[in-house]
């Protein structure tokens, strides 16, 4: 019986902690959501422009090396 409790107790503690975490979590209000969405959109745009410019630079270099 002691071995069973030794196996079950960590699971029980994890469930208890998880329930406590979910109860403390709150949905973001509209202003906070808009800030997070804007930051994410700006990050996507920056990464897209970086990828575009890297590809723009490497296409002519690749054509010179391979197509030469």
Curated annotation (Swiss-Prot):
Primary site of residence: endoplasmic reticulum
GO molecular function: protein transmembrane transporter activity; ribosome binding
Keywords linked to the UniProt accession: Endoplasmic reticulum, Membrane, Protein transport, Translocation, Transmembrane, Transmembrane helix, Transport
Cytoplasmic compartment segments: 1-32
Location of the protein in the cell: Endoplasmic reticulum membrane
Record bears the keyword Transmembrane: yes
Extracellular side: 62-68
Homology family: Belongs to the SecE/SEC61-gamma family.
Classification via PANTHER family: SEC61 GAMMA SUBUNIT
Protein name: Protein transport protein Sec61 subunit gamma
Organism: Harpagifer antarcticus
């Amino acid at each position: 019986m002691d071995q069973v409790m030794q196996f079950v107790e960590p699971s029980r503690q994890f469930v208890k902690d998880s329930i406590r975490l979910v109860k403390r979590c709150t949905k973001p209000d509209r202003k906070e959501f808009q800030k997070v969405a804007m930051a994410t959109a700006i990050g996507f745009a920056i990464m897209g422009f970086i990828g575009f410019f890297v590809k723009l630079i490497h296409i002519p270099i690749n054509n010179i090396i391979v197509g030469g």
